[in-house]
Amino acid sequence: MGIKHLYQIISENAPDAVKSGEIKNQFGRKVAIDASMSIYSFLIAVRSDGQQLMNESGETTSHLMGLFYRTLRMVDNGIKPLYVFDGAPPKLKSGELAKRIARKQEAAEQHEEAKETGTTEDVEKFSRRTVRVTREHNEECKKLLKLMGIPYINAPTEAEAQCAVLARAGKVYAAASEDMDTLCFDSPILLRHLTFSEQRKEPILEIHLDRVLEGLGMDRKTFVDLCILLGCDYLDPIPKVGPNTALKLIRDHGSLEKVVEAMKNDPKQKYTIPDDWPYEQARDLFFEPDVRPADHPECDFKWEAPDVEGLVKFLVEGKGFSEDRVRSGAARLQKNMKTAQQSRLEGFFKPVAKTDEEKASLKRKHEEKLEAAKKKKKEDAKAKREAKSRPKGTA
């Protein structure tokens, strides 16, 4: 799930933190990818007639199809991917996981009912909600990656946290995930939409944490407190606290401790904090996650030549893939992994730190942008109200 509405908060309040571009702009970069999130998206997206792809034996192949071709696309564009798999979830996450299982069970029942009485759209909608990544899916994907020569590592717990460690250490350029909580784990750069299909035509979003903090005017602790208040995987959200309210509360009070105190002392009792809401533990999980240091032997990785015959045996003979396409894909891997060895020119230069004067200028420009956006929003709202109040037939 990640952090609710965080991207909205960033795009509205720290727009300079987000760069949008094509996949080819990532040429020559090593990227740590949240494997479980990617596999889940493949199971949902790679479908035929509302159903997951299957071979003649009835085995699901959507995850393998997605992983094979999306990884090829990255390598074609000069990216060197490293996949990071989830380990055991933290205990604090068990409540959220239990809710997800319950929702999937409910969706499975609705899916069966929709097949009897609903439309095609209903069937597909409920079918997608039943999807979950199994241990077998993960093991098959690891086998495929090994045959492709693409490295992977297993995280002790949260994959996003391990990706962030590698990014901070400079072993990879960025962490890639759709989960915005990757920023809470202190990844300097987050890439979104990297594993999306080309057909979706979604730009790659590159989010820089230092610019997020600068744009919001927060340090990391305050930012993490904001994210917990917005709603994360570890805690139930506080009812009636939406994105704008969460941002205002954190800005007004400065920390979750003071926000909670203000809520409890509010004579109107506007907000009801859930009985079990251990926000300190949630914060600790973001600041001290169970991860391996970047120099740990299990965090060593390298890209190798693909095992062409192994790929044919696994995908063609075992899973019913087209042999021509698999061999063609293997040839692309062999060719493009060599191209990806080239370094980006930017790698030879260190960024120059901004002066206080430059920082003040950037902040002033950012505030002017926000003010202009607010003014336009008010003017648009006023124009809409006036348009509604005019009698019909008048210009």
Curated annotation (Swiss-Prot):
GO molecular function: 5'-3' exonuclease activity; 5'-flap endonuclease activity; DNA binding; magnesium ion binding
Region (I-domain): 122-253
Cofactor note: Binds 2 magnesium ions per subunit. They probably participate in the reaction catalyzed by the enzyme. May bind an additional third magnesium ion after substrate binding.
Region (Disordered): 103-123, 356-395
A Gene Ontology BP annotation from the UniProt entry: DNA replication, removal of RNA primer
EC number per UniProt: 3.1.-.-
Residue positions binding DNA: R47, R70, E158, G231, D233
Basic and acidic residues bias (residue ranges): 356-389
Record's keyword terms, sorted: DNA damage, DNA repair, DNA replication, Endonuclease, Exonuclease, Hydrolase, Magnesium, Metal-binding, Mitochondrion, Nuclease, Nucleus, Phosphoprotein
Recorded family membership: Belongs to the XPG/RAD2 endonuclease family. FEN1 subfamily.
Stated name of the protein: Flap endonuclease 1
